[in-house]
């Protein structure tokens, strides 16, 4: 997918997230999840921070731990969002949203994916991921 198209899709997601933050209603959540689903179906991608797996010669998504102790992968809708991270994100890759969702559902050690964890944030637990992407199982 051309980068410009992916950027446009992610801008739609950011706009929906901002609307949800301003009006956190079930209807606005449903709208935001629909926007994410449409972007996913159109081949949308997010920027995923990764870190090396010690001794394995592989990388894995980086994890952020929330105050309740839950562990989450995180992804960004743009490089601008990535730059808001308090940590230096050294390695990233573009991941198809649907493949990222499938991987998250198959990883028992994480609670879900946080999109833009430091600004314009959307926390997608596994239940919400299943709503966006029906047919995926743990």
Model-derived segments and spans:
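An interfacial alpha-helical scaffold signature
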Residues: 1-138
């Amino acid at each position: 997918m051309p980068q410009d198209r992916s950027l446009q899709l992610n801008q739609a997601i950011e706009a929906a997230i901002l609307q949800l933050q301003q009006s956190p209603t079930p209807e606005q959540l449903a709208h935001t999840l629909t926007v994410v689903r449409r972007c996913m179906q159109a081949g949308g991608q997010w920027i995923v921070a990764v870190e090396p797996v010690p001794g394995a010669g592989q990388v894995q998504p980086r994890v952020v731990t929330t105050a309740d102790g839950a562990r989450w992968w995180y992804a960004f809708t743009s490089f601008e969002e990535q730059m808001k991270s308090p940590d230096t994100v050294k390695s990233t890759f573009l991941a198809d949203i649907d493949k990222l969702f499938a991987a998250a559902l198959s990883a028992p050690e994480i609670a879900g994916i946080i999109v833009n964890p430091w600004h314009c944030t959307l926390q997608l637990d596994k239940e919400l991921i299943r709503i966006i992407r029906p047919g995926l199982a743990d």
